[in-house]
UniProtKB/Swiss-Prot annotation:
Pfam families: Histone (PF00125), Histone_H2A_C (PF16211). One of its GO terms (molecular function) is identical protein binding. CDD domains: HFD_H2A. It is found in: Nucleus; Chromosome. Residues 1-13 have a biased composition (Gly residues). The gene is HTZ1. The keyword Protein biosynthesis does not apply. GO terms for biological process: CENP-A eviction from euchromatin; nuclear-transcribed mRNA catabolic process, non-stop decay; regulation of transcription by RNA polymerase II; silent mating-type cassette heterochromatin formation; transcription elongation by RNA polymerase II. This is Histone H2A.Z. Belongs to the histone H2A family.
């Protein structure tokens, strides 16, 4: 029944060779955890003039995003471990990003509930040291 509904004859669906193989996603082929297909869709939707996006471009952007995420999470995990807690909070992310010079220049965003870095101005420290020195002399 070639023209009606039902099983089709031929094509890739009916071949015996493809029955044993399982499909691998672009992420699995590239050895990534982040979804390459979703990143490619976002790239296609957010480009102007509906430009074409190559598969390798999506894989590359996905790899960069995964690397940066792993880097930030590792540093935030170390910050949480130093404070002897088991949960990463926005404060730990803030400490991790602002503690690394390269990440600080890359991520200039304000992190909600991140707080501020502890820092005392040198001019204020000099005044405190001078007061202590004057008290010891007197």
């Amino acid at each position: 029944m070639p023209g009606g509904k039902g099983k089709s004859i031929g094509g890739k669906a009916g071949s015996k060779d493809s029955a044993g193989k399982s499909q691998k996603s672009h992420s699995a082929k590239a050895g990534l955890q982040f979804p390459c297909g979703r990143v490619k869709r976002f790239l296609k939707n957010n480009t102007q003039n509906k430009m074409r996006v190559g598969a390798k471009a999506a894989v590359y952007v996905t790899a960069v995003l995964e690397y940066l995420t792993a880097e930030v999470l590792e540093l935030a995990g170390n910050a949480a471990k130093d404070l002897k807690v088991k949960r990463i909070t926005p404060r730990h992310l803030q400490l991790a990003i602002r503690g690394d010079e390269e990440l600080d220049t890359l991520i200039r965003a304000t992190i909600a509930f991140g707080g501020v870095l502890p820092r005392i101005n040198r001019a204020l420290l000099l005044k405190v040291e001078q007061k202590k020195k004057n008290k010891t002399e007197a």
